[in-house]
Every structure is written in structure tokens, then in C-alpha cells.
Amino acid sequence: MPSTIALEKEDHQRDAEFKKVMHGDSAKAAGGVAALLKKNTEAQQIAVDEYFKHFDNKTAEAETQADREARTKEYATLTRHYYNLATDIYEYGWGQCFHFCRYSPGESFYQAIARHEHYLAAQIGIKKDMKVLDVGCGVGGPAREIAKFTDAHITGLNNNDYQIDRATHYAVRDGLSGQLKFVKGDFMQMSFPDNSFDAVYAIEATVHAPKLEGVYGEIYRVLKPGGTFGVYEWLMTDNYDNDNVEHRDIRLAIEVGNGISNMVTISEGLAAMKNVGFELVHHEDLADRNDPMPWYWPIAGELRYMQSYLDFFTVVRMTHTARRILHGFAGILETVGLAPKGTKKTADALARGADGLVAGAKKKLFTPMYLMVGKKPLN
């Protein structure tokens, strides 16, 4: 089913040249701060300007439909520059798997992250030697884990050249380059032929689509008949009321802090799956499970939920005190020229997004893990 929204024209040469100027050889750095300090300042300023032009001086009270349409028209550029700015901060603060998860007693942070990935692979039924597509693969953390868990061959699709370089670097490092490959592309207009993959998954990535029918329709097209697609989707719950300014403020905070042009509700997400032709096998808000600790506890800095002393070094960075210290330090590094301009502004936007995520979760307005599993009919 073709997308009904205007698509951005792709220019891979332009994007590759920009990546080379902005990121240089930082894709091979250790990650996090080490990579962040290697950026080209002028190129980073371009990325900052291109991204924040959609959000600066925009409030929930004053936001118009035209504002949202302007973002969706440049959905690919908005997302690409968001990850030009945020990738190293993500790796520093969270790791190489850019998603949330559920937690169990006695389970460390990274064990929980891996279990969340395994659960999706099991729901889809990914098996050895299957040809699988990861839509919006980030730096390849989930692809590496699922490849090891299932022995499948996974292709990661990403519109950010820097993340593709990092994903490729990590795959080689881990001896997985025979199972993994990473491809540049816009998931609203994939270059793969029809019926190419045995299975497809997306982990908190298709939220960047300007219209879910567009990306789900492309997934349906490239999936083989009888194949299964599974997704952890970011959605506003059906408690969300767009006429409520507080609700809109929470949604806008999540969008600006996470590179999202147009987040929709659970009802709209389910409708999108059905509209493109998927037979829904299962759908569920995993955030509504009766878990002993909430999915958002790390970004809320709720240290009482730590299950391992090693988690402290990850989670302490998320506390409000640590954020203030780190963001102030980033500002100092910018001033003396050791960090590129826009580093603090980006970190502040991510912090605003984290606060929006927590507020949305506590008010039952948002979920980052609405599980949908759909099958493409044989006929």
C-alpha cells in the first residue's frame, strides 16, 4: 500500500558527504564522549539549526496543525539530524540498544534490555538462517543480540550514515559481519524488492515515520507472504486528549526530545496495521503488565529499583542532579572549544524528552512498548 504523504527526495551522496565532514573518523572511536569530542563544529551547528528550527519557540499552547505538517514534510531530515546530534549522547548515557524494556527482580539493566529483544524475536518466530529486516536499526545493538540469539541473517535499515558506520564497526568487532549488514535508506520508500524478507521487526523506530501507514505499508511490501512483522511502537494511549494543553505539552516534550515529527495514538497505530493488510496476531501494551518496577525507572533516576551495583553507573547519569552537572560541564566544554556548539542544547532537549516520557507514563498517556504482531496473508 503506497504512502499517502509526500516523501522527501533521497540524496545519499549529500548525506554521505555531510557525515564525513561532521563525524570524520569518530565512528571508530570508543563511543559516547570520546566520539562526541571529534565532531566538526560548523557541521554540527548546521545539524542543530536544521533540527531545532522545527521546535524552537514552539509551545503546546501555540502549536498549530501547520507546525506539525512542516515537521512531517521534512521527516527524514529531522530524524537524520536528530541522530547526528544524539547518537553519541545515547551511547554515553544508555548503551548501544536505543530502547526501553520491562524489568524483573534480580535482573541487571543490560540483561533486561536483551530479554526485551529476545521476547520480540520469539513473538515473531525468528529462526536460524531466516532473512530478517530490522527497520530503524540504530547502531545495531538489537540486531547483534537477535542475530546471536536466533542465528538469523539480519539486514539493518537506517537513514543516518553515522549510525550505519557505527553499526558496521560493532558487527566487525563482534565477529558478526557474516550475519549482519547495514543499509542506507528511508523506511518510507525502501529500495528492497517485494517479498524479500522472511520476517521484519522494528524496535521503537517507526515512531519517526510521518504516517504509520507509510512505513507499515513498505514493511508489508518487502515481507514474504506468510511472513511476520513485530513492532514495539511508541504511541500515545487512548487516554490522550489533544484538546488538553497539559497532554499536548507532554506529547511535544517527547517529540522534541526524541526526533519525532508526528506521534499518534494506540487506536491509530492499530488501524494503520490493519489498513495496510496485516492480520493482527497479537497486540498489547506491555507497559500495562503488572511488573514490580516501572519501565521508566532508569530515566526517572529512581535508584531504589537497581538490581545490580553495575546499574548504578548507567542510571546515576539519569538523575536530575547528574543531568545538571553534566549539562553544565557540556556548556563549559563548548565555551572553551572542546565540545561542538549545540552539545548542551541537544542534551537539554533529551532531558526535556525524558521528563516528558516519565510524565506521560505516570499519567497513563504514553507507552514505548505497544507490541503489535502482524502476519502477511499467503494470498
Curated annotation (Swiss-Prot):
InterPro entries tied to this protein: Erg6_SMT_methyltransf, Methyltransf_11, MeTrfase_SMT, SAM-dependent_MTases_sf, Sterol_MeTrfase_C
Catalysis: reaction(s): lanosterol + S-adenosyl-L-methionine = eburicol + S-adenosyl-L-homocysteine + H(+)
EC number, UniProt record: 2.1.1.-
GO aspect biological process, one term: methylation
GO-annotated cellular components: endoplasmic reticulum; lipid droplet
GO molecular function, one term: identical protein binding
Keywords of this entry: Lipid biosynthesis, Lipid metabolism, Methyltransferase, S-adenosyl-L-methionine, Steroid biosynthesis, Steroid metabolism, Sterol biosynthesis, Sterol metabolism, Transferase
Keyword Lipid biosynthesis: yes
Statement: the UniProt record of this protein carries the keyword Nuclease: no
Pathway annotation: Steroid metabolism; ergosterol biosynthesis
Miscellaneous comment text of the record: In Neurospora, the biosynthesis pathway of the sterol precursors leading to the prevalent sterol ergosterol differs from yeast. The ringsystem of lanosterol in S.cerevisiae is firstly demethylised in three enzymatic steps leading to the intermediate zymosterol and secondly a methyl group is added to zymosterol by the sterol 24-C-methyltransferase to form fecosterol. In Neurospora, lanosterol is firstly transmethylated by the sterol 24-C-methyltransferase leading to the intermediate eburicol and secondly demethylated in three steps to form fecosterol.
Family, per entry: Belongs to the class I-like SAM-binding methyltransferase superfamily. Erg6/SMT family.
Protein known as: Sterol 24-C-methyltransferase erg-4
Gene assigned in the entry: erg-4
